[in-house]
Regions:
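Alpha-helical transmembrane segments of multi-pass small-molecule/ion transporters
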Residues: 1-305
Length: 305
């Protein structure tokens, strides 16, 4: 129960931050260009800082084994996400993309660090990496209807991949950063939650809530993304032995996060229904304030038995 209350409090704080972004956009203080700038700061500054910071832990056999377990778990969970989403929304590319891909980087990390610690980010880095690789390949193919391969240069120069590479080097070499760099990293990482929620608020402000309420597909996508897939993942994490609670909770929350904001980015990039994509992101984000705490509470009951 204590974990659930901590998580619920964190979710409420995040939604208050989203309300700031919402109000600022509606008041004309954040423009569409300003929203893009916030997104760029997230992608190129705060999220990489959070990832690198997560790797600044002591190298132990336990952590190395945990990293391998988290890689295997992330691969299995994302395969489940893609398969379930495809089965549920065969003819709707945006719905299938939205149901398959969550938002662990911007939404999951603040929740995971709230109930665990900054070091738990270490275990969800593989999930974030694999998810983005799938979005670039399978996700784009889904939206365009064309088979696309991975662009090696794009993958290797992506901010999150560079951050993971730097983090792994620091972890395996045991190098210590000077205090001035770790403090700078702390400040940049601290931007992640407020910037991410300001961005969510901007997305919400672009939506007509009356139209959203009338679009039945949004409820279906949210149900699959926030309830069906997380329950399947919860079952898998419960029955598979040898997985520590840091990895369990990290993977569960990553899989239970709302629709990733990249859906709207890719929809606009490939001339798909941008409004529908934004509404899908917004609706699932609103609903997750209820689903994530309940899911974590259920996990706490099952994993304490």
């Amino acid at each position: 129960m204590e974990t659930t209350l901590i998580l619920l409090r964190q979710v409420l704080i995040m939604f208050l931050l989203a309300a700031v972004g919402f109000t600022a956009y509606r008041a004309g203080k954040i423009s569409n260009e300003g929203g893009k700038t916030i997104g760029n700061l997230l992608i190129y500054v705060s999220l990489p800082a959070v990832i690198v910071k997560g790797f600044l832990v002591e190298r132990t056999t336990e952590r190395m084994i945990g990293l391998l377990i988290s890689m295997a778990a992330a691969a299995v969970i994302l395969a489940v996400c893609v398969l379930v989403a495809r089965l549920c929304f065969k003819k709707d590319a945006i719905a299938s993309f939205g149901a398959a891909f969550s938002n662990p980087g911007f939404f999951g990390i603040p929740l995971i660090t709230a109930i665990l610690n900054d070091g738990a980010v270490f275990y969800i880095a593989p999930f974030i990496a694999f998810l983005n690789l799938l979005q670039w390949s399978y996700g784009v193919s889904l939206l365009t209807g064309k088979k696309t391969g991975l662009n090696a240069k794009q993958v290797l120069t992506a901010p999150f991949m560079i951050a993971i590479a730097v983090g792994l080097i620091l972890f395996f070499t045991g190098l210590s950063l000077p205090s001035v760099l770790t403090k700078t990293l702390d400040f940049c990482a601290g931007l992640n939650t407020p910037l991410a929620m300001f961005a969510v608020g901007v997305y919400l402000a672009q939506c007509s809530f009356l139209k959203m309420l009338k679009r039945g597909k949004l409820y279906a996508v949210s149900a699959v993304r926030l309830v069906l897939i997380p329950l399947i993942v919860l079952a898998l994490l419960t029955v598979i032995p040898g997985i520590g609670n840091d990895i369990r909770y990290g993977m569960l929350i990553s899989a239970a996060c709302p629709v990733g904001s990249n859906l709207a980015v890719y929809a606009r990039l490939h001339d798909k229904d941008y409004t529908y994509a934004v509404e899908t992101v917004a609706a699932s984000t609103l609903f997750c304030v209820v689903t994530i705490p309940l899911l974590v509470q259920l996990a706490g009951i099952l994993w304490s038995m």
